[in-house]
Amino acid sequence: MIKINTLFHMILICSCMGTCFGFMEIIVAAGSYLYQKLPCFSGACCTKNEIPANYHALEASLKDKLFGQPLVLNTVVNALKSHWNDNYRAEKALTMSFHGGPGVGKNYVTKMIQEALYTQGTRSPHVHMFVARLDFPEVSKVPEYQRNLARWIKGNVTNCPKQIFIFDEVNHMPAGVLDAIKPFIDYYDYINRINFREVIFIFLSNTGAQIVNEHTYTLWRKGIKKDEMKLSDFEKLISQGAFNEKVSNRILVTTDLQFQELWLICVFYVLSQIRKVNRLLK
């Protein structure tokens, strides 16, 4: 606010003197700059400096640091690219649901997304993490949780539309909490004059591991290599809501991904090596 007051004083002095020897051009430029930065005085900035959305960095991180999840790389990067595309107007908020047992990389990938999209990464004021057992522990308080959650989303999206809301341990979340976000992820242009179409919602759940392991093994027995498996190979399970009923039955999910167990990947590798040895011995 000191900068703005100083600017006003300079304009007043120049007006009284009747001339500023070209200084007015500088004042106009400074005024334009400060005008663009005004939102930053009252809250978090919402420009490309704070939200660079570096998809190349995300792709590189996933390739270098994520092991054994071939379905994740292309699906996640493409979904984010198309959602925050300057030449494309998103029709609705992006909703991504990640399933799998502990330690398969769900939170790791979510962290990579935050670090690639935002300059401050996980510390960005545009990133919001909710953990079911910490933030929504009591079933009796579901109506209160719904009100607070809706209020929090509205307030932050009003300041900047490019927000990420992450819900961890969805399988432990009391039924009904996620109903609060339904209006924000539907095909509405505006709700109360607020645009929610650029928002990203990520749901993390520990369900579905056994189901996908069995299906992955079946595909492998049919001769489909793990790196050749596609998201379409799991669409039937997804359409049946086999992974997480608390999300699939309530939320229109844009991208649904099942993270595969790392021990299963090791088993596939060992079996493939045994097959190679057997072929050589024949």
Predicted feature residues:
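Pre-Walker A (pre-P-loop) alpha-helix and adjacent loop at the N terminus of AAA/AAA+ ATPase modules
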Residues: P52-L94
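C-terminal alpha-helical "lid" subdomain
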Residues: M17-C40, N107, K111-E115, V253, ...
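Conserved catalytic/switch belt of AAA+ P-loop NTPases
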Residues: K154-G155, A175-I202, N206-Q210, R221-K222, ...
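Walker A/P-loop
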Residues: K92-V127
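Conserved AAA+ ATPase core "coupling" helix
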Residues: I211-K282
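Extended, charged/polar low-complexity intrinsically disordered regions
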Residues: I2-Y55, K65
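Short glycine-rich substrate-engagement loop in P-loop NTPases that contacts/grips substrate
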Residues: S124-C160
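Walker B catalytic acidic pair
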Residues: D168-V170
